[in-house]
Amino acid sequence: MVKVLSVHSFRGGTGKSNLSANLAVCLAMEGQRVAVFDTDLASPGVHVLFGFSAGDKDLLINDFLQNGKPIKSCVHDVTPSAVKAAKGRIWLAPASMESDKIAKILREGYEVERLNDAIFDLVEDLKLDYVVIDTHPGINEETLLSTAISDALVMVMRPDSQDYLGTAVAIEVAERLDVPQINLVVNKLPDCFEPDSVKQRVNDSFNYTPTAILPLSADLLNLASGGLAVLECPDHTWTQSVKDLASLLHAQVSNTQ
């Protein structure tokens, strides 16, 4: 049975999309069939990490939501060669970067229930093992409904006072939605921060121990979202931490019905 992972943050700039893409790769490197949905329609970006650039005839998730195009026509195979060699597959449902389409979706909205139904239709067509949803930051109806169908939630935050305040709200909402597994990930931890102190503060603030603490890395900054870190920097500490996170998530959702 397919498992749905939502990757969320209360604020933008946490590295949520980067983590979504790299988690998808880690799962696919284990031979899983994974689809990534970019539902951050106001500020899409996960497609950049996969090197996807929409052509004039390429259909995007906006075309499904507002123009009635079939969802299967709006997903694209973005499987890297290393993932193919590992017998995995990755599909991407990218969102439009065109300003008029972004403005239209913000102005008119969309039926989230319809998107949720389409995700599960696609599961059958592509025989998916995992769906990774890259959400829009903050708390809104669209995010709530996509989170509600998740088997596990990855809440991404930085060690920043505003993130602590906002993340508390987001976790409370997720708990009310009865998300089976809630995981806190601290990302972009500067070298000057002591990981154990951050872990303790997170635990004191939310009563959750961080599932992962990921470093702020100059190597990843140099990559500048121009590739997938787990493939470009396979021996990096950040990569190993994300692989460990993917393994933990796989174990969590494998135990859910």
Per-range role (PLM):
Residues 1-4, 252-257:
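Acidic-aromatic/histidine active-site loop/patch
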Residues 33-34, 42-92:
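Phosphate-binding loop that captures ATP/GTP phosphates
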Residues 42, 98, 162:
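Conserved Rossmann-like nucleotide-cofactor binding loop
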Residues 72-73, 81, 86-137:
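Cytosolic-facing regulatory segments adjacent to core modules
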Residues 113-216, 221-222:
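Conserved catalytic-core segment of NTP-binding enzymes
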Residues 225-241:
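C-terminal boundary of histidine-terminating zinc-finger modules
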